[in-house]
Amino acid sequence: MQFNIPTLLTLFRVILIPFFVLVFYLPVTWSPFAAALIFCVAAVTDWFDGFLARRWNQSTRFGAFLDPVADKVLVAIAMVLVTEHYHSWWVTLPAATMIAREIIISALREWMAELGKRSSVAVSWIGKVKTTAQMVALAWLLWRPNIWVEYAGIALFFVAAVLTLWSMLQYLSAARADLLDQ
């Protein structure tokens, strides 16, 4: 296995995850800002590793596997942390919706790949918008410098949940013929 800069960025994102969790729970006033900063750095590497892999023609099978895994683990852990912090339905409901969608679509992609139809459920533009809304909302909910940022984060978290459902319906619609084929 050959390591290149895009793959190393993805590995760096994975390595940041335990530090992100530890910093989140530090009993100091700067903990929310530091946790949000670590999350943002990790989120930027998610965009940057894919960009560099395509730009430098350094895509690898290992990188293609690890990138979505690192992304989903980072986001799921961030959702668990903000859900635990807020301990209210208005954060838990969108988080549960987004986590459920990721499980459903991951299973759908795997199944479609077995059928040789992976491109039928490739990432769409709405998925990219959803991811952006999700990352920004999570960063705001982690940072929470004031009540207005928290309200904006919760509102954007709901927007991300709606986009999550929309993109899931698009993926299921694209795979409908195969899903219903007996």
Swiss-Prot record:
GO terms classed as biological process: glycerophospholipid biosynthetic process; phosphatidylglycerol biosynthetic process
Pathways involved: Phospholipid metabolism; phosphatidylglycerol biosynthesis; phosphatidylglycerol from CDP-diacylglycerol: step 1/2
Cytoplasmic side: 2-13, 83-87, 170-182
Span of the signal peptide: none
InterPro entries cross-referenced by the UniProt entry: CDP-alcohol_PTase-I, CDP-OH_P_trans, CDP-OH_PTrfase_TM_dom, CDP_ALCOHOL_P_TRANSF_CS, PGP_synthase_bac, Phosphatidylglycerol_P_synth
EC number: 2.7.8.5
Membrane topology, from the record: Multi-pass membrane protein
Localization per record: Cell inner membrane
Residues in the Periplasmic compartment per record: 39-61, 109-146
Keywords carried by this UniProt record: Cell inner membrane, Cell membrane, Lipid biosynthesis, Lipid metabolism, Membrane, Phospholipid biosynthesis, Phospholipid metabolism, Transferase, Transmembrane, Transmembrane helix
GO molecular function annotations of the record: CDP-diacylglycerol-glycerol-3-phosphate 3-phosphatidyltransferase activity
Post-translational modification: The N-terminus is probably blocked.
GO cellular component, one term: plasma membrane
Tree of life domain: Bacteria
Catalytic activity field: a CDP-1,2-diacyl-sn-glycerol + sn-glycerol 3-phosphate = a 1,2-diacyl-sn-glycero-3-phospho-(1'-sn-glycero-3'-phosphate) + CMP + H(+)
Membrane-spanning segments: 14-38, 62-82, 88-108, 147-169
Similarity comment: Belongs to the CDP-alcohol phosphatidyltransferase class-I family.
Functional description taken from the UniProt entry: Catalyzes the conversion of cytidine diphosphate diacylglycerol (CDP-DG) and glycerol 3-phosphate into phosphatidylglycerol. Essential for the synthesis of anionic phospholipids, thereby playing a role in balancing the ratio of zwitterionic and anionic phospholipids, which is thought to be important for normal membrane function.
Protein name: CDP-diacylglycerol--glycerol-3-phosphate 3-phosphatidyltransferase
